[in-house]
Swiss-Prot record:
Cofactor requirement: Mg(2+)
Listed GO MF terms: GTP binding; metal ion binding
KW Metal-binding (keyword) present: yes
CDD domains to which the protein is assigned, alphabetical: YihA_EngB
Family under the similarity heading: Belongs to the TRAFAC class TrmE-Era-EngA-EngB-Septin-like GTPase superfamily. EngB GTPase family.
Keyword DNA-binding recorded: no
UniProt-annotated binding residues for GTP: 31-38, 58-62, 82-85, 149-152, 187-190
SUPFAM superfamilies reported in the protein's UniProt record: P-loop containing nucleoside triphosphate hydrolases (SSF52540)
The protein's name: Probable GTP-binding protein EngB
Domain EngB-type G: 23-209
Amino acid sequence: MSLLHQARFFTTVNHLRDLPATAVPEVAFAGRSNAGKSTAINVLCNQKRLAFSSKTPGRTQHINYFSVMPAKALDPLGFLVDLPGYGYAQVPGEAKSHWEHLLGDYIQTRSQLAGLVIMMDARRPFTDLDCQMVEWFLPTGKPIHVLLTKADKLTNNDASRALMSARKVLAGYQAQIEGEVSLTVQLFSSLKRRGIEEAQRTVAGWLCLPEAMPPSPDAEPAKKTPSPDAQRGE
């Protein structure tokens, strides 16, 4: 059984000053308000209501921490961090501004953050806000893993095309930065339970959990492609 199945609620944070003073690794989950983020977290942890999925998109405006630890352990081995969903226009302006700053500051400055999982709807990935999230996080040099959620809504051919397209987008980001950063992507469906083990392996590896296994072939890293200038020999 995955140690992720033993995740439990730890705390809710509304200001950076309230972040837990711990040294263990954290894996954060981000995504648009309707990308199925909370549902995916629940499925990965094999729990129904670990992460609260509001019927009102954009309602969750805090950072929620879930500890990962064996049943009899005294201290967490790591944390899953559920970030506020972004991109919902009907959130009041002041509240929206607050949690956008909270989210941005957290992913850019939190030293304990080991990696970022970004949920994107497989039917329309890499929206402007999704790209902004990637661009916010890239300078940290830490890995990004994209879950193309709701893959069950696509035919097999369309799902394969969506995956190939996403890999090309990530390869473009890889070409823009110095050094190698792990940028991976996979198909995921909470309803059909597709891609769960692959995602669990990635998260467990980032948290350095004992169960960590080699990545699945589906989570193929983006390959660095030459920039247009390089291709022209300039």
